[in-house]
UniProtKB/Swiss-Prot annotation:
Name of the protein in question: Cytochrome b-c1 complex subunit 8
Organism: Ailuropoda melanoleuca
Membrane topology summary: Single-pass membrane protein
Protein's gene: UQCRQ
Function: Component of the ubiquinol-cytochrome c oxidoreductase, a multisubunit transmembrane complex that is part of the mitochondrial electron transport chain which drives oxidative phosphorylation.
Locations listed in the record: Mitochondrion inner membrane
Family according to the record: Belongs to the UQCRQ/QCR8 family.
Modified residues (N6-acetyllysine): K33
Length: 82
């Protein structure tokens, strides 16, 4: 069927280029270019993301407060009780 790995057939007219793993850097320019790029992207989309979260928070707090107030009894209804 075919040869085993390590003893494969030789292919002609195929050129491959590779870089040694010892010459590669794991995180090149991670702190000098990566973090500022993240901050730039966050600043660009903050006006698209933050307003819905603020609106949801305000609606949620208002709804929770109204729910708690609706569970309370009206003290004026029990003024004449002994």
């Amino acid at each position: 069927m075919g040869r085993e790995f390590g003893n494969l057939t030789r292919m002609r007219h195929v050129i491959t280029y590779s870089l040694s793993p010892f010459e590669q850097r794991a995180f090149p320019h991670y702190f000098s270019k990566g973090i500022p790029n993240v901050l730039r992207r966050m600043r660009a989309c903050v006006l698209r993301v933050v307003p819905p979260f603020v609106a949801f928070y305000l609606v949620y707090t208002w709804g929770t407060q109204e729910f708690e107030n609706s569970k309370r009894k009206n003290p004026a209804a029990y003024e004449n009780d002994k």
